[in-house]
Amino acid sequence: MSSILPFTPPVVKRLLGWKKSAGGSGGAGGGEQNGQEEKWCEKAVKSLVKKLKKTGRLDELEKAITTQNCNTKCVTIPSTCSEIWGLSTANTVDQWDTTGLYSFSEQTRSLDGRLQVSHRKGLPHVIYCRLWRWPDLHSHHELKAIENCEYAFNLKKDEVCVNPYHYQRVETPVLPPVLVPRHTEILTELPPLDDYTHSIPENTNFPAGIEPQSNYIPETPPPGYISEDGETSDQQLNQSMDTGSPAELSPTTLSPVNHSLDLQPVTYSEPAFWCSIAYYELNQRVGETFHASQPSLTVDGFTDPSNSERFCLGLLSNVNRNATVEMTRRHIGRGVRLYYIGGEVFAECLSDSAIFVQSPNCNQRYGWHPATVCKIPPGCNLKIFNNQEFAALLAQSVNQGFEAVYQLTRMCTIRMSFVKGWGAEYRRQTVTSTPCWIELHLNGPLQWLDKVLTQMGSPSVRCSSMS
């Protein structure tokens, strides 16, 4: 590695020798991109070494990296950005960006108060875990601290541990197979399939005070990401709960199928593309479907035509586009970031305007009507799907018959509008009345449903030429 600074201390060179390299980058620009990455890494390590020398923790960092041992001590730096990087204005770690992927001038502060260092910004533990352990790390959602880390990022102490071996990658939980009878004896009486397409959805504000139902969120997001702690207040839920009730995860009170039949396990498998996204303007589909292969992607209003981590709506043309749609498109901006991590899907509003989400899985978690539309303000994120919750529902629905399983297909579709909301509290009461919106199809759950339905056979209600 060629030296890119006037002087590179030996300890920096040693630490850089342990840097994990991402997979080979193809294309003509690969060499230039790798050179820029090496420059960034050297500056990041040199900045950290300079700070740790003052506190005497440098040896512990080198020990942790060279031995790759999680039993090493915490390697801490002050949790204020100003102390970390020598700036005079205090700027708490809570204001760091979660990814470190945006480009800005070196050692400057952005208008929103977050700090950029050497053309990038990010949470310090994410930066150094990416550098020394997981080059493909996207977000702090993918990390959880080990139990004996006293200064883990999620503890929000005055100092934060950046020992890369004090963090673990969040693993995707293995979903148990669903046991499906070869020929299901369907219940004689089943509840009718709910149809929400023609009803006016209710609205609710972002659930800032709701306790999450899953332990797979490894760390509390910074205050800028309004978290889901506490209990729901009446003011937050602008909806009437007597219009519908979520499906319960408790055992059904209906009689189950005949268990003397041959049960076949149907397993879940991850698809090559975890979701497909279609873009609409009012009731018209615009452009091609975007197939998401990366665990983190953004849907924005810009114009990059060939990035697997971005679905850029600014490229798409529509001869029927009216002035309202055109104006709305200009306000999409950075749009929404979608994460698929540990079997969970998160939506983060990056735009300066709110986004509006209709997720039946999320609505059930919070006890809302299945068609409720949730407003996510700028800078906030929300878990919009959970594979384990879906697996529990699927296992229960198999006992209720073909129609109950088929109804779960609606849970695998998530609708999201930009800038303009819809529902009972808005002038626009259907998603097809909003100027710009997208529809996500979650491919893994949909393919799992397909395999289960194929195994189950036919629905109980027969369809004849006379029906």
UniProtKB/Swiss-Prot annotation:
Presence of the UniProt keyword DNA-binding in the record? yes
The entry assigns this protein to a family as follows: Belongs to the dwarfin/SMAD family.
Where does the source fall among the domains of life? Eukaryota
**Where in the chain are disulfide-linked cysteines found?**
none
Positions carrying N6-acetyllysine: K19
Q: Which GO terms describe its molecular function?
A: chromatin binding; co-SMAD binding; disordered domain specific binding; DNA binding; DNA-binding transcription activator activity, RNA polymerase II-specific; DNA-binding transcription factor binding; double-stranded DNA binding; I-SMAD binding
Residues with the Phosphoserine modification: S240, S245, S250, S255, S458, S460, S464, S465, S467
What is the protein named? Answer: Mothers against decapentaplegic homolog 2
Specify where it is mainly localized. Answer: cytoplasm
Q: Where is this region: Disordered?
A: 207-251
Task: Give the function comment from the record.
Answer: Receptor-regulated SMAD (R-SMAD) that is an intracellular signal transducer and transcriptional modulator activated by TGF-beta (transforming growth factor) and activin type 1 receptor kinases. Binds the TRE element in the promoter region of many genes that are regulated by TGF-beta and, on formation of the SMAD2/SMAD4 complex, activates transcription. Promotes TGFB1-mediated transcription of odontoblastic differentiation genes in dental papilla cells. Positively regulates PDPK1 kinase activity by stimulating its dissociation from the 14-3-3 protein YWHAQ which acts as a negative regulator.
Q: Report what the Swiss-Prot or TrEMBL entry states about this protein's PTMs.
A: In response to TGF-beta, phosphorylated on the C-terminal SXS motif by TGF-beta and activin type 1 receptor kinases, phosphorylation declines progressively in a KMT5A-dependent manner. Phosphorylation in this motif is required for interaction with a number of proteins including SMURF2, SNON and SMAD4 in response to TGF-beta. Dephosphorylated in this motif by PPM1A leading to disruption of the SMAD2/3-SMAD4 complex, nuclear export and termination of the TGF-beta signaling. In response to decorin, the naturally occurring inhibitor of TGF-beta signaling, phosphorylated on Ser-240 by CaMK2. In response to TGF-beta, ubiquitinated by NEDD4L; which promotes its degradation. Monoubiquitinated, leading to prevent DNA-binding. Deubiquitination by USP15 alleviates inhibition and promotes activation of TGF-beta target genes. Ubiquitinated by RNF111, leading to its degradation: only SMAD2 proteins that are 'in use' are targeted by RNF111, RNF111 playing a key role in activating SMAD2 and regulating its turnover.
Pfam families for the chain:
MH1, MH2
Q: Where in the cell is it found?
A: Cytoplasm; Nucleus
Name all MH1 domain ranges. 10-176
A GO BP entry: positive regulation of epithelial to mesenchymal transition
Q: Where is this motif: PY-motif?
A: 221-225
Residues recorded as bearing N-acetylserine in the entry: S2
- Bias (Polar residues): 207-217, 233-243
Task: Tell me which positions the record assigns to the signal sequence.
Answer: none
The UniProt keyword set, sorted, is: Acetylation, Cytoplasm, DNA-binding, Metal-binding, Nucleus, Phosphoprotein, Transcription, Transcription regulation, Ubl conjugation, Zinc
Start and end residues of each MH2 domain: 274-467
